[in-house]
């Protein structure tokens, strides 16, 4: 065999090496794919599938396509990615170290799952956490330098609460070495997966000291995740809100108070309540502009805090109220969660954190350049009475300029309109260094006493159909000790007919009114309050002396008071025709009055009377609803009763309580909605709203026909202009016909006006003239 030349040997060795190298290059990629899939359990503790792999053995570049990783001990997908690529330091592999740089996930889909304290990534964290034990020589250390997620979608599931939430178009780029002692800098940007919104920013954290810093911009971010956490705390209800923010914060994870932040934060379109259309609390916008917030240094410096169009509704039912219905009696739903050690609820944690941040607010250096509440609305409904009581503060405003601890006093002005009638104002002068040191002036005026008829009916059986409430006072509080004067005036209160129903208690209101009412037909009392803010003392001496004075001094003025009352009644009856609830017939006095009007029109052929029916539809509907409910129940429980109730049966139904235990059980048994708490809702469910609307229409038409019938005999009905019925809340609390005279006023009415004006000039009534101007003599 011929001896090979050195050149031949070189060529053979080189070609062999190149051939083996070429084979290695060619098989490296499929070999890597095979190796990762074959030893996936050893490497990751999970099953991994890869559609295609590319490995560059010269540069250490690795690219994997269509990667899927399952959950531990499951075939459920945990992660999938269109592409995963990175650079691996080849030389460190010889020292059992895997250094991965520029690890990039293209369009990944990841599902994070929490079950109590366990997460579905716990095994991965444990596997890839570097082993710092000096005795460890067998394990591999894995180190990451820079990680990027591009256009990802991250899902989070809490199996206990439960929570299902995700974010999309996620871009996260972590720069630097992910190892102890290094600062990790991260840029992020993502969209809300549910609803609208974007969040982007920059975040750094020192993994050794746990110092952090972040700049975050949030644009119209849907807080649906809050809704899901709230559902764990409530029995029913809906929530929605959007967040806008631009904030910069520094701090340390070891101390909640060691943070310093500034920027702008706004909650928009906040709604929380029974349903998506029935709010208990809401506001259009809450905006905070923070100059510096640093609890550790006791700095709370705000440029402005502005709450726009807040709404709050508080309701009392026969059992509990709307707050207790939401969160359980005494907040039992919340305590059930907070008592569980290690239980996480985002809402509770946020509240706890805010409490920590604001704990020392009044003992700190605080400043609010502008504090304002605009166009507020507070509504109170009481369904526990025989009739529904409702009152509303709208609009409510609060303005406080320059709330600064360095100032001696801070002035706060609160103004409120009271619906359906009235207004109020409160002026406060507060020592910013001591909240128990303040002065207060308040005034509430033009409030019709008929608003409170549901309470009067429930506890006395007597409503009031006339009267205006005025309330004012001054408080001076120093170190928590009160010195105050409180003045209440009720102008021209008048007791109406007694209502008879088993829901109502009875008190002799006409007698009580005779005792408490003073000579000028007013109730006028001063009630000083002293003592401590935590234990105020009411002084009734003035009220008692006035009561005795009314008993012994008022009788000589009785003729005068009777004359005034007669004239007021004559004027009122000439200008209005009052209808009791569900009344469709006229009493003797009303018939007599209509005959007088008929005679006046007959003798004054040019006179024209206008009639404007005003229907208190809300109350009329409520009373019709109660009657129809009791009637249907009576028919069901009295098989012998005919479909047309007799007069005796009607009286039984009328006096029956709509809150009779047997009736309530029947109503509750047939409810179609588990969040029907008021007797009114249950009655509507029982009889339907259609029949109530029909009965009201029939009642309105019947009243108009009945009224006109008294003028047809003499042909004076042609001198009457009957307008369409208007739905309103009357000042006197009753439906009525408002009467007007186009061609002259009846002489008797004119004379009565003149006489009443003369009587009002007397000293007994003159001092209350300004109050009488606050409320109409007759209903609007």
What is the predicted function of each stretch?
Residues 2-14, 293-298, 303, 359-366, ...:
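Extended terminal
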Residues 21-116, 144, 172, 177-179, ...:
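Terminal hydrophobic membrane-targeting helix
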Residues 40, 64, 84, 103, ...:
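Buried hydrophobic packing residues in well-ordered domains
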Residues 45-47, 74-88, 100, 161-173, ...:
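Amphipathic hydrophobic-ligand
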Residues 66-174, 274-395, 492-510, 533-547:
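Secondary-structure transition motifs
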Residues 126-160, 182-191, 198, 252, ...:
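Solvent-exposed beta-strand/coil patches in large extracellular/periplasmic or lumenal scaffold regions
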Residues 204, 217-219, 266-268, 308, ...:
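Outer-membrane beta-barrel pore domains and translocons
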């Amino acid at each position: 065999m011929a001896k090979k030349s050195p050149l031949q040997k070189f060529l053979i060795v080189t070609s062999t090496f190149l051939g083996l190298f070429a084979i290695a290059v060619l098989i490296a990629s499929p070999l890597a794919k095979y190796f990762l899939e074959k030893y996936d359990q050893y490497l990751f503790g999970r099953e991994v599938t890869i559609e295609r792999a590319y490995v560059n053995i010269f540069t250490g570049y690795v690219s994997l396509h269509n990667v899927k990783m399952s959950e531990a001990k499951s075939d459920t997908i945990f992660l999938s990615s269109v592409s995963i690529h990175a650079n691996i330091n080849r030389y460190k592999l010889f020292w059992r170290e895997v250094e991965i740089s520029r690890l990039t996930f293209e369009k990944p889909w990841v599902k994070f799952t929490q079950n109590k304290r366990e997460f579905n990534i716990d095994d991965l964290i444990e596997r890839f956490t570097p082993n710092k034990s000096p005795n460890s020589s067998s394990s591999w250390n894995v180190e990451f330098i820079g990680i990027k997620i591009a256009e990802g979608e991250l899902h989070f599931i809490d199996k206990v609460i439960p929570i299902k939430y995700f974010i999309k178009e996620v871009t996260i780029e972590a720069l630097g070495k992910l190892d102890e002692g290094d600062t990790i800098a991260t840029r992020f940007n993502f969209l809300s997966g549910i609803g609208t919104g974007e969040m982007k920013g920059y975040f750094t954290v020192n993994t050794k000291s746990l110092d952090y810093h972040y700049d975050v911009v949030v644009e119209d971010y849907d807080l649906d995740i809050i809704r899901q956490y709230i559902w764990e705390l409530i029995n029913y209800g809906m929530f929605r809100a959007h967040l806008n923010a631009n904030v910069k914060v520094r701090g340390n994870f070891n101390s909640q108070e060691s943070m310093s932040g500034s920027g702008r934060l706004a909650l928009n379109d906040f709604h929380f309540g029974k349903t998506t259309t029935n709010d208990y609390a809401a506001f259009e916008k809450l905006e905070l502009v923070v100059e510096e917030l640093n609890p550790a240094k006791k700095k709370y410096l705000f440029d402005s805090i502005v709450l726009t169009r807040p709404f709050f509704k508080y309701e009392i039912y026969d059992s509990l109220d709307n707050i207790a219905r939401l969160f359980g009696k005494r907040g039992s739903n919340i305590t059930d969660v907070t008592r569980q050690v290690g239980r996480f609820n985002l809402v509770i944690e946020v509240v706890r954190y805010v409490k920590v941040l604001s704990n020392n607010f009044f003992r700190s250096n605080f400043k609010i350049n502008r504090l304002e509440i605009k166009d507020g609305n507070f509504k109170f409904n009481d369904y526990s009475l025989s009739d529904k009581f409702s009152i509303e503060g709208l609009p409510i405003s609060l303005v406080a300029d320059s709330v600064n601890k360095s100032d001696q006093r801070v002035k706060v002005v609160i103004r409120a309109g009271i619906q359906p009638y009235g207004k109020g104002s409160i002026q406060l002068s507060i020592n910013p260094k001591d909240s128990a040191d303040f002065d207060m002036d308040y005034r509430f005026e033009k409030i019709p006493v008929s608003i409170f008829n549901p309470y009067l009916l429930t506890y006395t059986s007597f409503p009031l159909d006339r009267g205006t409430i005025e309330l004012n006072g001054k408080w001076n509080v120093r170190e928590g000790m009160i010195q105050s004067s409180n003045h209440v005036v009720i102008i021209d209160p008048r007791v109406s007919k007694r209502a008879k129903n088993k829901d109502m208690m009875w008190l002799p209101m006409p007698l009580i009114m005779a005792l408490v009412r003073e000579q000028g037909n007013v109730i006028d009392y001063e009630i000083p309050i002293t003592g401590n803010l935590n234990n105020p003392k009411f002084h009734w001496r003035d009220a008692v002396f006035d009561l005795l004075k009314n008993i012994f001094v008022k009788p000589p003025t009785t003729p005068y008071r009777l004359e005034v009352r007669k004239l007021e009644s004559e004027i009122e009856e000439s200008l209005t025709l009052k209808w009791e609830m569900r009344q469709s017939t006229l009493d003797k006095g009303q018939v007599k009055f209509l005959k007088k009007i008929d005679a006046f029109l007959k003798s004054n052929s040019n006179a024209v009377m206008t009639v404007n029916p005003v229907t208190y539809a809300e109350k009329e509907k409520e009373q019709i609803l109660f009657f129809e409910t009791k009637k249907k129940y009576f028919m069901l429980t009295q098989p012998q009763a005919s479909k047309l109730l007799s007069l005796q049966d009607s009286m039984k139904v009328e006096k029956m309580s709509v809150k009779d235990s047997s009736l309530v059980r029947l109503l509750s048994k047939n409810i179609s909605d588990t969040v029907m708490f008021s007797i009114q809702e249950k009655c509507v469910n029982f009889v339907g709203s259609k029949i109530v609307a029909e009965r009201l229409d029939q009642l309105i038409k019947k009243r108009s026909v009945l009224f006109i019938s008294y003028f047809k005999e003499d042909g004076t009905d042609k001198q009457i202009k009957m307008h369409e019925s208007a739905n309103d809340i009357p000042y006197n609390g009753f439906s009525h016909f408002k009467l007007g005279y186009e061609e002259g006023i009846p002489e008797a009415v004119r004379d009565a006006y003149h006489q009443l004006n003369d009587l009002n000039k007397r000293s007994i009534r003159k001092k209350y003239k300004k109050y009488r101007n606050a409320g109409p003599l007759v209903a609007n």
